[in-house]
């Protein structure tokens, strides 16, 4: 009789194990540590996936297999040409252009701290901004133009290499490389910005508002997101998927037409996001050292925990979604998407309320502006809530215990 009770108790324990959620460790393909005493910040992958560069106190150039190609200089802001043959970097007031093999091509020191930079896909033009200034250069480092009247948030050189997109505290505008305006929308503050490789569509994210423009400055649609404010923006190279990281710990994903596809919860502020073509791999890094990976449907594929908080521009993914690269202060991590297995659907698909998204037939823009550098105050520590038992488990447990008691009598 006692033996039978022991069998029942063992069976109960087995059911507990089956019903409890299992967290599978994700093993990186490779890990490249920072040099002793150095800290890393930021990572960039070239459009063709041939160049991977991590920034910080010392740049580390890596192959897709994680091999160290070279190390040199320092740079907290990074950008590459489409083919990875040119790497633009900046730290403090210094901007450098280096070749994909690590050779210094030129270096310039400005009289302000650089807060953003951009390089044309074919490397034909370069732009840097900071402290109310913007400067444009040729590939050889020759000065094209400068302007000290714009309080700039972010800049992107258009894919043609002939124009530059600028967001400020008062507008979004496109100028030529001599900084003469081509078009502008002065209706409101504009912040984060991304462009498709073909340059046909432009996406901006400011606070809780996401907008899409055509290359000619026509406003296609506006979507108001619920919850917090945008801290990060990613736009798939094929134009299919838009990802916004928010300060309310959510990741919000939109389709090309502005429809909100889904919202997922993380556990802290989302400070860096990346998305592959088709949105099949979506990566979101948060301040609590966690990196969340989702598919296009909003299913959480897994969570990878690093040693330090995820800073802006610290997660990246190849266009095909097969390789994910993450940087914290201590190391660069390369992960295969195939190492993440579906675990749960984070939140149900959320239909877009018609009152939230506004589609605009055609609106031409016409320009000005105060510096704002985004700072991230340290959020309070969060605790990971313990998962409750699935509903059938308590019923099974009670039944087995009653059976055990009955057999004892």
Pin down the residues of each PLM region.
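C-terminal low-complexity, Ser/Thr- and acidic/Pro-rich disordered "stalk" regions positioned immediately N-terminal
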Residues: 339-385
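Blade-level signature of beta-propeller repeat domains, shared across WD40, Kelch, NHL, RCC1
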Residues: 304-348
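Residue-level detector of Asp-centered blade-edge/turn motifs that repeat once per structural unit
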Residues: 45-48, 82-83, 121-122, 159-160, ...
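A short beta-strand motif characteristic of beta-propeller blades
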Residues: 28-34, 67-72, 103-108, 142-148, ...
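Hydrophobic core register within WD40 beta-propeller blades
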Residues: 43, 78-80, 117, 155, ...
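Hydrophobic beta-strand positions that form the internal "hydrophobic ladder"
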Residues: 51-52, 87, 126, 164, ...
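A cross-kingdom C-terminal cell-surface attachment/processing module
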Residues: 391-407
């Amino acid at each position: 009789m006692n033996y039978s009770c022991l069998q029942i108790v063992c069976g109960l324990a087995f059911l507990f194990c089956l019903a409890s959620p299992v967290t599978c460790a994700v093993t990186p393909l490779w890990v490249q540590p920072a040099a002793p005493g150095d800290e890393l910040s930021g990572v960039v992958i070239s459009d063709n996936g041939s160049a991977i560069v991590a920034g910080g106190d010392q740049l580390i150039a890596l192959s897709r297999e994680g091999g160290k190609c070279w190390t040199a200089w320092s740079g907290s802001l990074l950008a590459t040409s489409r083919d990875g043959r040119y790497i633009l970097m900046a730290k403090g007031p210094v901007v450098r252009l280096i070749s994909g093999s690590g050779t210094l091509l030129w270096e310039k020191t400005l009289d302000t701290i650089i807060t953003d930079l951009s390089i044309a896909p074919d490397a034909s033009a370069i732009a840097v901004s900071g402290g109310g200034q913007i400067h444009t250069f040729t590939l050889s480092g020759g000065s094209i133009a400068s302007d000290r009247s714009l309080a700039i948030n972010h800049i992107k050189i258009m894919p043609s290499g002939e124009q530059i997109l600028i967001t400020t505290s008062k507008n979004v505008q496109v100028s030529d490389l001599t900084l003469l305006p081509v078009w502008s929308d002065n209706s409101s503050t504009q912040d984060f910005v991304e462009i498709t490789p073909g340059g046909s569509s432009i996406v901006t994210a400011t606070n809780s508002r996401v907008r899409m423009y055509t290359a000619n400055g026509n406003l296609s649609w506006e979507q108001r997101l619920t919850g917090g404010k945008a801290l990060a923006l990613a736009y798939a190279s094929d134009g299919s998927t838009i990802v916004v990281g928010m300060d309310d710990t959510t990741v919000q994903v939109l389709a090309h037409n502005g429809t909100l596809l889904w919202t997922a919860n993380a556990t802290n502020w989302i400070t860096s996001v990346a998305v592959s073509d088709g949105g099949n791999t979506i990566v979101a890094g948060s301040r609590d050292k966690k990196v969340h990976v989702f598919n296009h449907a909003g299913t959480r594929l897994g969570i990878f925990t690093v040693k330090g908080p995820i800073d802006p521009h610290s997660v990246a993914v190849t266009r095909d979604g097969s390789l994910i690269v993450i940087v914290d202060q201590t190391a660069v991590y390369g992960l295969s998407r195939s190492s993440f297995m579906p675990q749960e659907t984070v939140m149900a698909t959320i239909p877009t309320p018609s009152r939230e998204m506004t589609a605009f037939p055609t609106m031409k823009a016409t320009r000005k502006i105060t510096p704002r550098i985004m700072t991230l105050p340290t959020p309070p520590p969060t605790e990971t809530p313990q998962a409750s038992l699935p509903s059938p488990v308590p019923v099974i447990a009670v039944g087995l215990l009653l059976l055990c008691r009955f057999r004892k009598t």
